[in-house]
Amino acid sequence: MKTLQTVHRKLFDQKLAWSQIDKKKALAQPEQLELLREACLVESYLPVYTGKMMALFWDDLNATTIFTIESIEAYGHYYVLRRYLETIGYKPVSDEEVVELRERERGVIYTDRVRELVNFMGTEHFAAQFFLDMSQLLDEPVLAAILPEFAAEEVVHSQFAFDLLQARIRKDPGARSEILEHARNFKHVGAYVRPYVPPAKGDNVRSIRAFNEKFEKLLGQPLSDFLVEEVPDAVR
């Protein structure tokens, strides 16, 4: 499809110096490549996910603008990661694999705006940390150089969701309890279609702490405080 190839070149191909990729360095880190491949698969699902979110928020102009931006930037991440894996010759992602993944949740219709915003906010928060950590773990410099940009985009996406949730609270202070309930049951969007979404580093405490602080800004109290309140006195 020549037109699509032209758009790819214009929007995404210039992001990396493809001819300068050090394949030897890249292939020397198979554990990190597996993580990148998993991230690529999750990103491949997001155009379908954002389509569902557009349907859910069809009458919210700010939200639909936000998910349009998310869809474009998530696709950019997917495209770059997929082409990178193909370029270095490490387990290229196939069209069939992407379609099979997208099919897993094809019949699901989102109905709870708060639940999806909470899950989206958390997903993008952890995705930002993932790409930042990967940029520090990779020895191959070409991809490592672009991943902080991916991380910065994910930070903005998470803030988008925060802003939408904050607007709901301003309109209805009672929304705090609903947000809290979904925060307790947070689910990574990648886990909608994948069995497990691994962090880049085993120690994810810093990112979890920052997630807790995000809820403190939103709800006026850290999420951890609410969770402690639910623990019976006998086990404290």
Give a label for each model feature:
Residues M1-R236:
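Non-heme di-metal
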